[in-house]
Each structure stands twice: as C-alpha cells, then as structure tokens.
Design a protein with these regions (language model features):
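Glycine/small-residue-rich pyrophosphate-binding loop that anchors the diphosphate of NDP-sugar donors
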Residues: 226-229, 320, 415, 433
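Acidic, glycine-rich loop-and-beta core segments that form the ion-binding/anion-interacting portion
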Residues: 318-366, 371
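Glycine-rich hexapeptide-repeat left-handed beta-helix
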Residues: 1-5, 27-30, 39, 43, ...
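Short, high-confidence coil segments that cap the C-terminus of an alpha-helix
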Residues: 97, 150, 179-182, 267
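Conserved N-terminal catalytic core of the sugar/cofactor nucleotidyltransferase
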Residues: 2-4, 8-28, 38-56, 83-156, ...
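Conserved core of the sugar-phosphate nucleotidyltransferase
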Residues: 163-249
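Glycine-rich N-terminal loop/short-helix segment of MobA-like nucleotidyltransferase
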Residues: 53-79, 95
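Conserved alpha/beta core of the MobA/IspD/sugar-nucleotide pyrophosphorylase nucleotidyltransferase superfamily
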Residues: 48-53, 223-315, 323
Length: 478
C-alpha cells in the first residue's frame, strides 16, 4: 500500500503497546521504504512509555564555518536582523525549553559575549568541545561536563536559522507521547543528494542513518532525509554515546550512528516529519542569503495576514520584530529594520529606509529615499522626499520638505533635533543639532538652522538673493 504525501494523519507504525501511532503530516511512500522487515524482538514486548521530566536543549555551535571566510563565527552571522544562533535559541525559549546548553569551540568567547548581551539572566550554559571530533563528540562533551540535563535531551544545530518554535513544540509533543527512546526530525526531499538517508523497517522505526557518500544504490533511492534534530531520553543517549566508534576515514564520531545502536537495543528513533526548509543548515554566504530570503517571505506573509499591504514581496525587506499598524502600505524597495514601530494608515516608501529606533505615528507618509533612524515621527506628519531624519523628535501635523537633513553628528556624539507640532519645513533645509523648532513655526527653503526657533515664528537662514538685471548682455559685449 502506498501512502501519498499529504496533510492528513499518517500511521507510522505500532508503539510498544501495540497501538498505531500517527503524525500530523504524511511524507512516506511505499517505494521509499527500506525493504526490510527484520524488526527488533524487543519491540514486540509491551512496555509503558515513561513520563518525561522536562526537556533540555543542546545546541551544537562549535563549527569553524571556514566557507564563510569571516572572522565572525558562523552562527553569529545574521538572518532577518538577528544571529542564526539566536533564531535557534529563541525557538527553544518560545517552545518553553529554558534549559539550554551551547557547545562551543574556539568561538567560545564570541558566543559568551553574544549571550551576555542578548540573554542576560537566561539559563544558557556553554560547554567547550576541545577538539573538533564530530557531532557525537560534541554532545558527549556535555555529558562529560556533568551538565544536569533533564529526561529528554533535544539536540539541534546552531546554523539552522529557519527552525520555528512551532516545530520544536511539535517534536517535543511527539517525543513525550510516542517514544520510549527518541525521535528524529526528518523530511522528504525530491532531490536527496548530499543528505543522510533514513533507513526504516517495515513499521517505520529508524534502523540506521546512512550518509550519502556511504549509501548503496538502493539506499540512494530513499527520499526521506535526516533533519539533524533529535530528542533522545537522557539514559539512552548517555549509554549509546559511549558505544559510538570513530569513523576511520574522518577520525570523527558521528551522532548519526546512534540510530543503529538504539534500534539494536530495542528503543529505536521514531521519524517525525518537519518542514524541509527548517532543516537547512547555513554553510556559506550564498546559503545565508537564501535563508534570509525565506525568513523575509515569512515575515511579509504574516504582516499581510494582519492587514498590511506589501506592494512587492520581491523587493521589500522587513526584519523580524517590526510592528506595523493596520491599513499601512509598504511600497517597493523599502528596508525596515528590527525594532521599528509604524502606526496605522501610513504610506512607507518606495525606497525608504527605517532603522532601529524609528517610531512612526498614524497617518504618516515616509516617502521616496527617506531614511529615519532613532527618531519619533508624530501622527499626520509627512516626510515625503529625499530626507534624513536621525536622532530627532518630530511632532504631529508636520510637513518636512524634500531634501531636509538633520545634521546630528558633531564628530564626537549624536545630537537631537526637536521639531514641534504643526511646523512647516521648506525644501533643502538643514538642522544643525542640537536645535529645537517651536510649534507652528515655518522654516524657509534652503535654510541652515543652527539656533532654536520659538513657536509661531519664521526662520530664514540663507544668503539674500542678489539679481543683476542685464548682466549677461553686458558680459557678452566685453
């Protein structure tokens, strides 16, 4: 019988009590199943699934990332405004996994500095993997360090920035309800070349994981691949890590070998389908860009579902952590960084750049080639063309003319510009901060404002125009 890939419930085999198990998303097909019915005698023995007393996360982040060609460690390169490792940690925290251990190598100090700045007060430990001896050795470093792990140990890679809290939660649910040994995240790939293949018995328990280079002709036809995310009972993990032998060709210990060991002892891994994209590891700058593109699309889709119009998904870039009000329109070639807040009924772009600290009120227009950074813009205010607003406080009902610049940096520190409610700023004006413009004041076009302007005042700060009638004709006669 063939089970087609679809979104229906799918029976993955009987558990130790003889009851059929299901996962929410089917991915197996008959032709991909390893043609083996060996089974394990221990599986036929009825056993009760032991309750799980909590989940610990172990995140592998010691890799050198040489293909990135960077002094910055690979897992700290950013996707959608935050480091890859932060995406993985945040997915765990959002899934209520607060006991987290990160395995580091030579990048230990970089990772500790990152965590101190971003997760101060969170229970995040670091363990050193002294030598790069493979994924099993990395996990064993945590065991040898006598970290007090909980009953379920979730193992993830720090370079998978597309992983979501929903997937982590789903895997934990499947582990606690279905497995007496462990589960492994897997996915279906039309082109599985380069990935480890999941070899299963007739009941869909994982018999072993075969790396692509080691797969025979039959195994190469398997399209169910290893996702590199596991949840394994602590006692089984500790016991089987000690049994993993070094790969003679590479001189490393592979965590994938644990699948065959767990199968042999009658506590096999259960395969659980996870979205293919979420498994993708980042090893190069090109893959980093691809991950950012995928993350960005998810951000835009979510905003669209909440009543925001994104005119062109291909050219708008919005990082995670941005708040945008209903009925706002984001035009093409606009970049909005994490932490920006935009009110309702606004028009942003095209080609606008909103950076950290920008807070835009309701019914505002931030138009062509406008950059706003660390500034508040009040309700019903227009900054329509070719302007830089930095370290500023702009009131409500203000009109900022084209080419306006807030000159905020004096060579030592950033200074603030304040423009009161109802002010009108003529085109090509420059505010040399610190400076304050009063309510309902008017700034003449082309002015360079260096002094404060009181409420209801007109300020003009430009050379007086001088016109010499007939000057051109006189010049020609010379």
């Amino acid at each position: 019988m063939k089970n087609k890939r679809n979104n229906e419930k799918y029976k993955v085999g009987k558990n130790l009590k003889g009851k059929e198990m299901e996962i929410d998303v089917a991915f197996f097909s008959g032709k991909e199943r390893a043609e083996s019915s060996d089974g394990v005698e221990a599986l036929k023995t009825e056993k009760i699934i032991k309750p799980v007393n909590g989940i610990s996360a172990v995140i592998l982040a010691a890799g050198k990332g040489t293909r990135m060609k960077s002094d910055k460690t690979k897992v700290l390169h950013e996707v959608s405004g935050k480091p890859m490792l932060a995406h993985v940690i945040d997915a765990c925290l959002e899934a209520r996994v607060s006991d987290i251990t990160v395995v580091a190598g030579a990048n230990m100090q970089q990772l500790k500095s990152f965590a101190a700045a971003r997760y101060n007060g969170k229970n995040i430990r670091f363990v050193l993997q002294k030598e790069q001896l493979g994924t099993a050795d990395a996990v064993n470093s945590v065991i040898k360090a006598k970290i007090p792990l909980k009953d379920g140990v979730m193992i993830l890679s720090g370079d998978t920035p597309l992983i979501t809290a929903d997937t982590v939660s789903y895997l934990i649910k499947m582990f606690t309800k279905k497995s007496d040994g462990g589960i492994i995240g897997v996915s279906f790939a039309e082109n599985p070349a380069g990935y480890g293949r999941i070899v299963r018995n007739s009941e869909d328990y994982v018999m072993r994981i075969v790396e692509d280079k080691d797969a025979d002709d039959r195994e190469k036809t398997i399209k169910v691949i290893n996702g590199g995310i596991y949840i394994i009972r602590k006692d089984s993990l500790e016991r089987n890590l000690e049994k993993i032998k070094v790969n003679k060709a590479k001189g490393e210990y592979y965590l994938t070998d644990i699948a065959a060991l767990m199968y042999a002892e009658g506590r096999p891994l259960i395969p659980v389908d996870v979205p293919y994209r979420e498994l993708a590891g980042v090893n190069s700058r090109a893959q980093l860009a691809e991950a950012a593109k995928i993350r960005n699309k998810k951000v835009l889709e979510k905003l669209s579902e909440n009543g925001i119009t994104i005119v062109d998904f291909d050219t708008v870039y919005i990082e995670e952590g941005v708040e945008i009000g209903n009925e706002t329109v984001i035009h093409p070639f606009t970049v909005i960084k994490s932490g920006v807040k935009i009110g309702k009924n606004c028009s942003i772009g095209p080609s606008a750049h909103l950076r950290q600290g920008a807070v835009i009120g309701n019914n505002c227009k931030i138009g062509n080639y406008v950059e706003v950074k660390n500034s508040t813009v009040g309700n019903n205010t227009n900054v329509a063309h070719l302007s830089y607003i930095g370290d500023s406080e702009i009131g409500s009902n203000v009109n900022i003319g084209a080419g306006t610049i807030t000159a905020n940096y004096d060579g030592v520190k950033k200074n603030k510009t304040v423009i009161g409610d109802g002010a009108y700023v003529g085109s090509n004006s420059v505010f040399v901060a610190p400076v304050k413009i009063g309510k309902n004041s008017v700034i003449g076009a082309g002015s360079v404002i260096t002094d404060n302007v009181p409420d209801d005042s007109l300020a003009i700060a430009r050379p007086r125009q001088e016109t010499k009638t007939g000057w051109v004709k006189k010049r020609r006669k010379k």
